[in-house]
């Protein structure tokens, strides 16, 4: 009895294709997708008349997953502006990468920008927040500890 493992983070999006392409472009792998609806789905969500598309993507090592969800019903008419990085609640995910600067350049070429600036932190990580589709914030982290030691 008790927790076995961390399974996934759910992310609600308006454009499932764009969100999926963004995360696949960062190295996630598509695991599968489906449409969900019905009484059980309504009860789980605490909403009536739910119909949603779900796409699961996972890290290459299979230890982390994102559940990308596009709700077709019911409508959500309350749309806040993209939240700043310090707004309380789940705000970003972090993925470890190689060659962070090249990834940032590619993301900029694809129309995405950083929230702040690339910074080396405590000679251990090179870090940056990137704003993806629909204002999602993804932190990129490159381990530079071994780079600094050589």
Kindly give the residue locations of the regions a language model identified.
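N-terminal beta-strand motif that seeds the catalytic metal site of vicinal oxygen chelate
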Residues: 1-20, 29-32, 90-95, 144-150
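Short hydrophobic/aromatic-rich motifs at helix boundaries and adjacent loops
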Residues: 26-28, 74-77
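Amide-forming acyltransferase catalytic core, primarily the GNAT-like/NAT-type
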Residues: 56, 73-74
């Amino acid at each position: 009895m008790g927790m076995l493992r961390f399974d996934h983070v759910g992310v609600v999006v308006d454009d499932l294709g764009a969100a999926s392409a963004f995360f696949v472009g960062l190295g996630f792998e598509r695991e599968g997708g489906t449409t969900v609806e019905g009484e059980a789905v309504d009860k789980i969500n605490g909403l009536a008349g739910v119909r949603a598309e779900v796409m699961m993507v996972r890290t290459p090592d299979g230890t982390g997953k994102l559940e990308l969800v596009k709700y077709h019903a019911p409508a959500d008419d309350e749309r806040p502006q993209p939240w700043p990085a310090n707004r309380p609640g789940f705000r970003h995910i972090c993925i470890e990468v190689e060659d962070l600067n090249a990834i940032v350049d590619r993301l900029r070429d694809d129309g995405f920008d950083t929230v702040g600036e690339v910074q080396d932190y405590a000679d251990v990580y090179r870090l940056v927040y990137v704003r993806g589709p629909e204002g999602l914030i993804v932190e990129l982290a490159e381990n530079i500890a071994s780079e600094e030691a050589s």
